[in-house]
């Protein structure tokens, strides 16, 4: 099977179709005109994963068709950044020439940045030894001498070898600010860097006249928290995943931001804490006094499942709500509750995933 054809000349057509679909989907609500934020038509995806196919002396990248499950060879991957595409053939050629590096390798993951750093994870169906580490170190040096700013990770069952760091440092331009973000391998990062910048700028614009404090649920590595910090007196943000919390703490320090506090707990537990249903030792240990915060704006960026009813009702207690959604279906369900108490004053489509049916939406609501 050959690689599916993706034609950048059709980019605007698919974006127009999404615009119409999202507008129609939310037509039952009183929404303002949809703001549409486009993606580059190609080389927009910051990360990519490929299986490795061994065929005699040859070795190459493959992907699998989602419907037929048939494999197809990938020598150039149009959605991926130029940085990934520039590295792919050089990496494959170098690995192909090393019995140690290619033996039982089955997958390669790339994580790139707009800042120029790239992280490559090489996955194996065997345990890795000192010989692998030595060859990988040589490979890393060779590629960096060719102009790449690259780190390598070797993974096998219950083991990981890191050369020399397991993260990249991304720099995003948000209006006149340059924000620094630590992005760790295997943790969530925004897949489309250019659109991520547009999302941050939109969020900053929506909240520029804010007063008081901001509460953010599901904050990840602090992606939005850091950009929004300048619009609020203080930001209190929650996140459950430990690697994301650690990255968020790093990012706060790297950007010299002193008004953001991250709490590691689930949105559901935080809802209970806010409503005084139970006390959480974690809050006491981190010296977080919820009563000292004057949060009249809340920011939510939930997983695809959306917010549960209890969290929706807690969110309704805030004057202003910003909701970023990767699943318009659950956003619509949540809006059925939120729109009873709040008006929708901003409505946006972010084309994070061109040429797919996936749509990222942003809604800003203010109390009626």
From Swiss-Prot:
The gene is trmA. This is tRNA/tmRNA (uracil-C(5))-methyltransferase. One of its GO terms (cellular component) is cytosol. InterPro entries: MeTrfase_TrmA_AS, MeTrfase_TrmA_CS, SAM-dependent_MTases_sf, TrmA_MeTrfase, U5_MeTrfase_fam. The active site is at residues 326, 360. Dual-specificity methyltransferase that catalyzes the formation of 5-methyluridine at position 54 (m5U54) in all tRNAs, and that of position 341 (m5U341) in tmRNA (transfer-mRNA). GO terms for molecular function: rRNA binding; tRNA (uracil(54)-C5)-methyltransferase activity, S-adenosyl methionine-dependent; tRNA binding. Keywords: Methyltransferase, S-adenosyl-L-methionine, Transferase, tRNA processing. GO terms for biological process: tRNA methylation. It comes from the Bacteria. S-adenosyl-L-methionine binds at residues 190, 218, 223, 239, 301. Pfam families: tRNA_U5-meth_tr. Disulfide bonds: none annotated. It catalyses: uridine(54) in tRNA + S-adenosyl-L-methionine = 5-methyluridine(54) in tRNA + S-adenosyl-L-homocysteine + H(+); uridine(341) in tmRNA + S-adenosyl-L-methionine = 5-methyluridine(341) in tmRNA + S-adenosyl-L-homocysteine + H(+). It is an enzyme of class 2 (transferase). PROSITE patterns: SAM_MT_RNA_M5U (PS51687), TRMA_1 (PS01230), TRMA_2 (PS01231). The keyword Ribosomal protein does not apply. Belongs to the class I-like SAM-binding methyltransferase superfamily. RNA M5U methyltransferase family. TrmA subfamily.
